[in-house]
């Protein structure tokens, strides 16, 4: 373990530059020395894509007990370790801005409770000034979820509300959140030339004054945890970002950062921008730096990872990546990327998310918003841990790691040994015979040749072969045609179940 520790700035710079090279960024990128360390005991942290913790038996995500590890003291502007990444989930604010994704107050509360099970550091739960119903929903979350402290671990989420740099916004946010144990206000204003000219109609100096006055006002109301962010930071002059963030820090902000609001940045330029801003913002060593990426060009996850590699230590994400237009960086993708490659490729950056709650959270958000993910959506799609190709199925049956870099149990999917196998026209003999054995049939080689031949015929008519189809092939023999197997009378064919037949 000692040989893995990074003990000098020069060593870390070399490591980061090696990582930049492997990720396609130029060697000359101005990544700062991050002074990363690994304070944890390697045996208690996930050191590969598949964790030992995920192997514990459970029937559903709700059966999984929280990982009982004492949380360090929460200090708004300080991290427990340089390589710890805070996760701010904004499903209940930015996610709800997805067209058609409006949530009722009870739904928001239920999702907030599930986010707490997921162990997000901060949950941004809405825009208090926007309506009376929104205000009351946020206040309810602050009073309940915001005060539910886990006595064993000390965990309680930070409850955050967003506010423009306007007094009435800040006042409404304080009134809604003051009941929480850890309230935070998320202040923002536009900083790009196009936004300042056409939206705000203000000069740079006026925008800086707005930001500074808002931070000071939030502090005067009682906020000790104050975040300031640049809207449309991805199209803002980098020196202006440094200037306004530096002034916000001086005024009392504890977390600062910027958003790629329109999703225009590419991973290389985004990482370089983050590195430049951290390196050149006065007071950056005294705060936590945050990033917020949108997915208009399909690179929100990549940009978020690039930003982390450049020194950002708070990521703003949503469940399933829902959000304005094409959405935000998905929490599940960012978290599992860090869990899978954070140790080996990114100098040990990590989160405290209980990834075993990911699937349950994803399903809940899908149900409540009506926004269902595509089957091949990374991490939470129905096909993520499913294999149909015969070559892949053969490998999976021998050892799951041949074609799976993550364990399904890591994200809360409880599977039997071979339940990731889907039978179809690409499936091979090994997978079909193995499934028949699972169903209780010991098939002779001669009989199996006949069954497999008819199985092939059946796949011409059906995209996926079910257990009922397989049972019919065994029980009824050659006289059962594929046409009959596809008929509504399939259950009639299976009137006498075969539990442990020898054919």
Curated annotation (Swiss-Prot):
Obligatory cofactor(s): Mn(2+)
Thermal response of activity: Optimum temperature is 32 degrees Celsius.
Activity regulation: Not activated by ATP.
Subcellular location: Plastid, Chloroplast
GO CC terms in record: chloroplast
Keywords: Chloroplast, Plastid, Transferase, Transit peptide
pH sensitivity of activity: Optimum pH is 8.0.
Catalytic reaction annotation: an omega-(methylsulfanyl)-2-oxoalkanoate + acetyl-CoA + H2O = a 2-(omega-methylsulfanyl)alkylmalate + CoA + H(+)
Domain of life the protein comes from: Eukaryota
Entry-linked InterPro entries: 2-IPM_HCS-like (IPR050073), AIPM/Hcit_synth_CS (IPR002034), Aldolase_TIM (IPR013785), LeuA/HCS_post-cat (IPR054691), PYR_CT (IPR000891)
Effect of residue 24 to A: In strain: cv. Sorbo
Alphabetized Pfam families for the sequence: HCS_D2, HMGL-like
Outcome of substituting residue 156 to A: In strain: cv. Ka-0, cv. Lip-0, cv. No-0, cv. Sei-0, cv. Tsu-1 and cv. Wl-0
Pyruvate carboxyltransferase domain segment(s): 85-359
Class of enzymatic activity (EC top level): transferase
Biological process per Gene Ontology, one example term: L-leucine biosynthetic process
Gene Ontology MF terms in the entry: 2-isopropylmalate synthase activity; methylthioalkylmalate synthase activity
Further remark: Constitutes an insect resistance quantitative trait locus, caused by variation in glucosinolate profiles conferred by polymorphism of MAM alleles.
Name of this protein: Methylthioalkylmalate synthase 3, chloroplastic
Biological source species: Arabidopsis thaliana (Mouse-ear cress)
Annotated gene: MAM3
